[in-house]
Amino acid sequence: MKFVINTSIACWLLAWPCFAQSPESDTLRIQQLRTVEVRTSRPGEVHSLPDQQGTYLMAGRRTELIRLADTDADVAQKNPRQLLARVPGVFIYDMDGSGNQINVATRGLDAHRSWEMNMRYNGVLTNSDMYGYPASHFSPPGESLERIEMVRGTASLQYGAQFGGMLNMVSKQADTTRRFSFESIASIGSYGLRSTYNAVGGRVGKLTYYGYAYWRHADGYRQNSQSDAQALFASLRYQASSRLSISAELARSTYVYHIPGPLTDSMFRADPRQATRTRNYFSPDIWVPSVRADWQLSNQTRLQLITSAVLGVRNSVLIDAFATVPDVPDAVTGQYRQRQVDSDHFNSFTTEARLLHQFQLAGMATTAVVGGQLMHNDLHRQQLGKGTTGSDYDMTLTAPFGRDLWYYTRNGAFFAEMQLKVTPRLTLSPGIRFEHGLTRMRGVITNYDPGNLPNDIRHQFVLLGISGQYRVNEALRLYGGISQAYRPVIFKDIIPASTYEQVDKNLRDANGYNAELGVEGRWKGVHVNMSLFDVLYRNRMGTLVQTGTDGQPYTFRTTIGDSRSQGVEVLLEGQVLNAGRLTVSGFTSTAFMDARYINANVSAGTENRNVTGNQVESAPRFTSRNGLTFRYRTASLTAQYSYVGMTYSDALNTPVVTANGAKGPVPAYGVWDLNATWRVTPWLHVRGSVNNLLNSQYFTKRPLFYPGPGVWSSDGRNAVLSVGIKL
């Protein structure tokens, strides 16, 4: 990275006393000094968040801070295995085509739209509906990101109760030294990729502004997998005084993805790029407005208030069937079948208040954070509508929705955490969170007895946690902690899949804990962060076979048991060679995990089967990402190899692939990537990537629901070139 420092003024001020004391001349000769250019670079290391990050307390936890400018990652396609390469154990699910949404999870959790995580953008919650559909459909462009912050679940009492922790994507900010600045990044790539990102920002008096507009098109690796994306962002911050700032932000992301459909294993082996659908589409359109106040009440006290919303819609129109069911015109009429139309309407409002205060307690330096969170969510779900027989993205109905439901949630939470400096080296952080809320489901399902629908679900938890940290010295720390967590019963859990399915009226929210114990240190340019973890997840949802009063079997949706994930996460990175202008650094980010069901039973045909000891689906035992980075002056080149072990698609651990591809093992895979960056001048940079260099054919998951059971091919070899300017 280059830093350009104009030293003219500094040299003039230093020289002034000498001129002033000269008796030989009362005139000054003015000489224009040359600009001095200082060039340096920061290694692409992952850093832990500081013990206090704004109004968050982070001591004693495993955290990661990734600055995108320090990496060579493919930002244009927001490639998560590169962006999060140095976060060990991250499971990545390829679903919506490159460049759209990031689907990630850690420690044996489900990666579907990152819904086990507390997802944020600039600290603002972006999960679509935390109690109805916690998936994050909001998808900011990679070009807009300055850094990514990840916090594991042991800190969840402060921001939510999610098992997966928090992932906060932080946007670039305005250059406050200028009234106006401009940035533009244009990208082209394989399979019709074209994108442009344009941003402006600056400061005028007490007002700081920043905004961007983004557009991207890609034809996609597979047939019928085009996507078109747009994003907008605007931010205004008013510095009312040296202690008070008020800001407002408005973010929007939307895209339309042409869904190519699932494959069977034989189809995948024959041609992983083929499609089984030509008329399936998915499109979220999400707005995230927010208002924030940061008030430094005193040198010891800080107050932060954020009011935000997630507003928008998630639409899909598709033929929902196995890969073995072709979507072809009727032999008699020549018409296609009518497509299924589904639509979720999100109206999620959140207010969060956080008060941080520093004081002495029994002679110990103490930092305390107390706060509250209020959620007011209305989710309107419309499903099983009959659409057109056409082939375009068209949400027109020809018959009413088969499901027309509302999911109302009112929830309040209070939390408190203290960071106690027991000794100059030892820190303890106990915390508590209290959740109290009610979710009400109303509406109709065609041909289903309303009396069989659960109506009200209460959420009431007291969650406890404690973390500790011991700094052996400035370069070495020991950390660990345990925190309780829970996941509310969501809309999907309580809606019967068919008239032959019933839902437990006494469903219980999932609950459990996150525990970790680790060591982090730096020694002679080597950075090591190694942690052990243990995640207990009670009340997992599933189905059992029951017998009705008429003697007929039926499917019963309920909690089917628990699971436990244990393992080790290791990050090792450091400089391998320093030969003046040429440096070579490397890293390995590796995790071993054993995630298994305990005390669990699931339905298998017409019987229930005990799955205690079976592996949790989509939880690889071994994940490793490794890379070497070569830096010469202002250019860098990174070669990365990613390996993900074999996983199962279902709790039964079905050993043999089914004919329709819906169940069976997901084979292990390895992928090579090559990325480069050249910072030509302080205002011009070029990035290039060759993803999946050896053209490996692989897939990451066999989904059991959306976008359809079966094999979903990940992208083969592809390249992208980006050029960026800053003025």
Where are these regions (language model features)?
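Transmembrane beta-barrel wall of Gram-negative outer-membrane proteins
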Residues: I188-H217, R222-H258, N280-T301, R433
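C-terminal beta-signal and adjacent terminal beta-strands/loops
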Residues: Y486, R538, V584, S642-N653, ...
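Extracytoplasmic beta-strand/coil segments of soluble accessory domains associated
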Residues: Q53-L57, L65-I66, V75, R81-S128
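Short acidic/polar hinge/loop motifs at secondary-structure boundaries
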Residues: V124-R152
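Structural signature of Gram-negative outer-membrane beta-barrels, strongest in the C-terminal barrel
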Residues: S241, F346, G363-T367, Q373-M375, ...
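Membrane-embedded beta-barrel scaffold of Gram-negative outer-membrane proteins
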Residues: D294-D320, R471, R477-S483, R508-E573, ...
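Face-selective signature of the C-terminal outer-membrane beta-barrel domain
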Residues: S242-I246, A251, D285-I319, A331-V444, ...
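Gram-negative outer-membrane beta-barrel transporters
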Residues: P424, L532-L536, Y554-N653, L694
